[in-house]
Amino acid sequence: STGLVGSEMCIRDSFRTVVRNYLINWARENDYDLFSDGLKIYTTIDSRMQEIAENAVSNQMSRLQQIFDDHWDGKNPWIDEKGFEIKDFLKNTIKRTRYYKSLLKENENDSIKVFDLLNEKKKMKVFSWGGEIDTVFSIMDSLRYYKNFLQAGFISIEPKTGFIRAWVGGINHKFFKYDHVKQGKRQPGSTFKPIVYAAAIDNGYSPCYPV
């Protein structure tokens, strides 16, 4: 499969990170040395399901990204409900980051100097669905670039046991550390539909009743 072309840093690293962080805390609380006490760690991940999940996310998101890029065609996608571009969107976004706040502290709250630093160009590698790209970007350039990427999370849980069989935290863990499975806020979405359907059936509606 070509699904993981843009994800040489395996997507499942997001799950490894979650497990590692949990075990570090567990080992500290239970007086174990995680790296020298010979512990064997087993998870409920099904390697076949994990590979299918990774390929599904990679294939689907790369396809949707192309549609997204074609639709916006070089225009900024951050718009308000009236369709107008949100003013100072990138500036306000960077201001909420710990990186910006640390720079501001280091530079005596001089925001002009901080933004001068944020706009300095330097060599860096960036993610693309065709593989890593070497480029020359400023921090603000990279923020603009990455804000144009669609994101996703994927988790498969066995209902009877609660075992996690597949976990994909994002499209590429090396470049996007945010884990959409663990850190993302949940919306009810389709999860609520069975409750609505059950209420309708209880009130005599058939599954084929037109609404």
What are these regions (language model features)?
Residues S1, S7-V211:
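Extended, non-catalytic substrate-recognition/exosite surfaces adjacent to catalytic cores, especially
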